[in-house]
Amino acid sequence: MNILKSLISVGIMTLISRIFGFFRDVLIAHIFGASMFTDAFFIAFKIPNLLRRIFAEGAFYQSFIPILIDYKSRKDKEYIQEFIRSTCGFTILVLTTFVILGIIFSDYIIFISAPGFSESSKKLQLASNLLKIMFPYILFISLSSLCSSILNSYNYFFIPSLSSSLLNISIIVFSFFFSDYFEPSIISLAWSVMIGGFFQLFYQFPHLYKIKMLVFPKINFKNIGLIKVLKKMGPSTLGSCANQISLIFNTIFSSLLHSGSISWIYYADRLIEFPIGIIGVSLSTILFTSFSCSYSNNTQSEYKILLNWGIRFGLILSLPISVILFMFSKPLVIILFQYGKFTDFDVLMTQKALELYSFGLVSFILVKILVSAFYSCQEVNIPMRISILTLFLTQLMNPFLIFYFQHSGLALSCSIASWINFFLLYWKLYQKGIINFKLNDFIFIFRLLIAVLVMTFFLIFMLYFIPSWKIGSFFDKIIRLFTILSISGIVYLIALHFLGIRLLNYSDKLFQKK
């Protein structure tokens, strides 16, 4: 498998999905602004999203793929199909029960997730109604993730990465054409989420059929593969839950702050998730499969090479982007969100949160790579323990940081906790002898920092000649921003070249060793 080719393919599709996602958020900001209605929607939407990250993209994904890849190399097709049938049947049974309970107890879930909503019965009831509509999304997206995991295991990365765009397209279509048919109109977004999840699932069926892995679900708790997945899912779920519980606590804190805080954090989070999705998710998705193959084939040298390549490539891409996000936080918020009911005050509040999120971007991305390295060799306890520790530290920091920074203190605590998470994971890999920090690694980081510094000085110089970002049409601003960032990217690449970091040669070395 050509890792760089797969990475580019997934990265491009993720970029397209994120562009749709930004267009979606621009529409929401334009139509609804930062109001009681958006706060209610974002809280309700966050709950199935948190569950998606735990069940679909977290514990299940990390436990299922290594076992499936191991079976691919040792078992016949019928054995693998039986494993998939049993896994699918178990997933449907558990999550259908979960969805029914979630709909029944939606009022209590909202009250626990956002206690600040209790001051407004209308806000609480609206969020509860939205949650009832969206709860089935967790079933659709979890089954979609199962399909994606199977396709990824067979080195089909393009199709699963495209499916994420379908949710954004659904929300865009409903915002444009159906919002006037609902009262209040924010309910249209809830229906768009559920329908988008439906299409994300069924879109992948023809591609599963092509590889003869489209099978009918079956309830079989005795399947050996399923039992292995469930055993691994215990610690994996705790690790995933720790991260998501931290987000729930952040939501609770933000619900107690100034009205609009939830929306400001959401919009800043959307901006920081853009590079995390394109770089972090793409890298970890591709590398996770490669790590699992290396572990299954017992080729530790290849495993170490892949991990070193992933960390270095992640640093090369994430460091300059973190600087750009910090320096261009205000222009990005203005260009993408300041329309309709989104005010100057909303821009300022979102900007503050984004600036503090940007400090953690590098660690957000590197943590995904390191966690993939652990899970691929079926080591789930270490990431779980570190996740629980960082959850505890984050919630210790939150009250103090909120006192000084209000809602943006939540962004800062996430960034600090992510760096702690990264260093602890790195240290554990170092103790295991998987990572060895050598002199050439120090030289690499030093050269990389110089290249980023050169780009930063160039950006500072360019900012002196840039007119106010409030001047010009949307497309004028986009062209202006794209031009500046493109030139800055070229400056960065030239600096890397002169400092001896040549991306093409660097990638070629990886494939030669593979």
Curated annotation (Swiss-Prot):
Q: What does this protein do?
A: Involved in peptidoglycan biosynthesis. Transports lipid-linked peptidoglycan precursors from the inner to the outer leaflet of the cytoplasmic membrane.
Q: Which family does it belong to?
A: Belongs to the MurJ/MviN family.
Recorded GO terms, molecular function? lipid-linked peptidoglycan transporter activity
Q: Tell me the membrane topology, using the record's own terms.
A: Multi-pass membrane protein
Q: Name one GO biological process term.
A: regulation of cell shape
Q: What is its main location?
A: membrane
What species does this protein belong to?
Buchnera aphidicola subsp. Schizaphis graminum (strain Sg)
Question: A single GO CC term, please?
Answer: plasma membrane
**The protein, known as:** Probable lipid II flippase MurJ
Q: Which UniProt keywords apply?
A: Cell inner membrane, Cell membrane, Cell shape, Cell wall biogenesis/degradation, Membrane, Peptidoglycan synthesis, Transmembrane, Transmembrane helix, Transport
- List where the protein spans the membrane: 3-23, 25-45, 92-112, 130-150, 157-177, 186-206, 245-265, 271-291, 315-335, 354-374, 386-406, 409-429, 448-468, 481-501
Q: In which pathway does it act?
A: Cell wall biogenesis; peptidoglycan biosynthesis
HAMAP family reported for this sequence: MurJ_MviN (MF_02078)
Tell me the superkingdom of the source: Bacteria
Q: Where in the cell is it found?
A: Cell inner membrane
| Lineage start | Bacteria, Pseudomonadati, Pseudomonadota, Gammaproteobacteria, Enterobacterales
Asked if Membrane is a keyword of the record, the answer is: yes
> One Pfam family name from the record?
MurJ
